[in-house]
Structures are given as C-alpha cells and as structure tokens.
Amino acid sequence: MQQTESPILTVPATSTLSSPEVATSADLREDFLKALRCMILSRTLEEKLGSLYRAGGRIVGGVYLGRGQEAFSASAGINIRLGKDIYGPLIRDQAGRIAYGEPILDCVRTHLGAVTGPMRGRDGNIHRGRPQEGYMAMISHLGSLVSVVAGALFARRLRGTLGDCAGATSIGDGGTSTGAFHEGLNMAAVEKLPLVISVANNQFAYSTPTTRQYACEDLVDRARGYGAEGYSVDGTDLLACIATFKKAFARARAGHGPQMVVGRLLRLGGHGEHDDASYIPDTIKHQHEGRDCIEVAKKQALKLGWASETDLQTWEEEARREVDAAQAIASKEPAPDPYRETWRALSTHELIEGQHG
C-alpha cells in the first residue's frame, strides 16, 4: 500500500479525512484541548522523572519516556472511560494514562517505590495498574497485553456485562512481530471483540529499524490479514489522531470488531533514559515523523483560535506545579517494609495492615 498525502489512511477504506476537513471539525475542539493539556502535563512529568533518574537516588530500574508520542497516546486515552472500559497501556503511554484519568501521583509514587502507590512499592515505574478497575498493569513481554485485554473483553461478554465497553492497548512497531500480538489480534478478530490497538510506529524496535522488521509497505496492512479494520495516521498531528481514534472507538463499540490504528512518528529519545539513541541517523530525525507533536499541537491551537499564548503558558505553569506537588508528597512516603509486607503487588484493595484476603 502506498503512502498518501492524507493524514489518515483507512483499510478497508471506509472514509479518508484530509487535513482541512479534520481542522474544521469544531466538534473536536473539546477533545483537542483536553488532549493537549494532558500532553503538556505528561511531558512535564516525564522531564521530572528523567531528571530524578539521572541524578540518582530513589528511582530504581529504568525510566522510559514517551517524548514524541504524546499526541498519539493522548488521542487514544481521551476515548477510554475510567472504570468502564479496559485499558492496557505500554511504556510510552504516560499521556494516554493521564487522559484516561490516572492521577500523576500514582505514577510518581510507583517510580519512587512508595508503599502508598498502586503497586504498593513492589513493582516499579511503568508496571502499574488497577486490574480490578479494568486498568491493566503493563507486561514486559511485548504483545501479551493484546491477549490480556482481548481476554478481559471476552470474559465480560461471557458474563453478560460487556455492554458498550471497549478495550484498548498499545504496542510499538517491533512488538507487532511477536507471536503474542498475532495470537491476540486473531482471537479478537474471530470473536469480533471491541478492541482498539494503538500501534506507535516510532521507526525503531530499540535499535532495529523498520527496514529490518517487516516487508509490508505499511504496518496497517497487517490489520487486513486478520479481517480487522486499520487506520494509518500522522502520529505527530493531534487533530488527525483525535479524529482517527474517535472513529475507531465508535466502530469498535458499534460491533465492527477490532480496530488497529498505526501512528507514524519518531521516538524523540532513546529506548530509555540509559540509551543515548546514537544509532538514529540525523536524516531520520529531520524527517516529517521527527516533529515534536506538542509544538505541532500548540501551533494548531493558536491557528484555530482554540487557545492563546497566555493559555499555553498557564497550562505549562499549572503542569509544573502539579508535578512538583506530586513529587513533594511521594518523596516523603515510605518504601514497603520487607519484614511486614506480603509482596503481593496487585492487592491494591488491601492497604490496611493485617489484611491478606
């Protein structure tokens, strides 16, 4: 399949939106502004986490950031209903987590190993969630979350509680080559489950370029092989991403089976903060996909008259205050006591000493 100038390419082709059509959709304004504020907060939070990691101290393990992927992630997150839908985010989905409704204090507590966090200090950083609420903790084995979220949807169907619930999970270009990804997507397609898969094609699976990962022209081609509906979108264009995910979630909820959204973008940093990404050529960094999606979104907001320079500055200041406040709280909270803890990371409903249910 050949790339087009349109920000959105649909397979099978049900509609194609051009940039002007997307930009003049006033009904996207509320979602756009919510997503943009989530992106700003996410970037501010991740800059703080990166700084704490480099300084050494309480953050144990790796720090994985979503710089460059915020627009794609947040656009999915604003469509996922907290406490109703099922969400299984991946390592670069901080913007999506915020848009979904996760308090940033949960993130900071987990990174600092506080016993008050959702993982109670037993599992760290990106491996956090509240499964009893439909918020799945990330699994390091890439592709596995596709089956987990699909299985959770199938379980609700069997129990008669599915209703208009949708499930969503994320994966990168490299993860789409795993067996778990294919098994999960195949099951979801056969059962016509309301699953939306966000594929962040950030050009590298750690240090392996896409030219060494797959031979199809666009990863969205893989959706067709399973009978799923697929969309290829400019992952740096917030307006296009919002319009695409809005449609994908609507079709999933309406019974059209799994939807796969592929975002074309670039990871603006290393695999983690330990990685200098020196293997990424400058020629790729300067391509269209290398644009900073937050700067693109700010320009869109100003051009459309949806926000002013003062608004943007205010949101950035508010984000800094919120992040600083979360750090101040979590920094004073204790780590788990190894002599008194059960080390059951996901027993989040049993924070009272002595309860082991």
PLM features: residue spans?
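Cofactor-binding active-site loop characterized by glycine-rich and histidine/acidic residues
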Residues: 47-191, 209-215, 220, 225-227
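Glycine-rich ThDP/TPP pyrophosphate-binding loop and its adjacent helix/strand module
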Residues: 134-332
